[in-house]
Amino acid sequence: IERYKESSVLRIGIDSSINKLFWAKMQKMINDKHSEKDFRFSKLDSYIGSRMLRENTLDIYIGYGLNDLEQPDEIGEKPLISSRIGAYIGHESSINEHPEFKAKDLERYVRYGTKSYLCSVMNGQKNDPQLLTQGIELVDNVDTMKLKVEFNDGYALADSRYFSYYDGDMLLLPGYDGECVIKAFYRKKRNKKKIKEILEELQNVVKS
């Protein structure tokens, strides 16, 4: 019986860069239709989330992408919501001193990013979205990226709506109209019916 109960619990990991606004929507889904016992939520960075999904110790991983060169065939994905890309800057950034600041003006500043957070290595263009390999000071993780931005008067591109930060500011700039997409990654062959139902619920509650 205990083993059955354990197998009926959905294990959902959420990218650690995603803020409380998104988590509140997850709680709403539980409160409206489910019980706390139905889920086991975890806050994970994308490296760990990708590995756990691949190793079948996670049923759904919610984030911007997987840290695999090629997405395994057994892993599916469902877009949940897109948000405009913004420029994350430090609270004391000199960028704040320029009220008419535009995206091209950022060329004077150091840009930071990490491969563990895909929004930070995008070009920011909606019509031609690309991942960049040059012009960015790459660091290991999101926390380090935020510290580098803060202490070096730099910036990083991020999800303007769902990026988690406690210090600093988020700017929406003319010239950056690209979007970050939060997706649900899942194992195709596990609990097919239940996973499909939950994915639909996730999409609906996030867009509500």
Residue ranges and their predicted role:
Residues 71-78, 83, 144-193:
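Beta-alpha-beta core module
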Residues 45-48, 52-57, 117-171:
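Hydrophobic hinge/microswitch elements
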Residues 96, 104, 181, 185-208:
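Extended ligand-binding regions for polar small-molecule ligands
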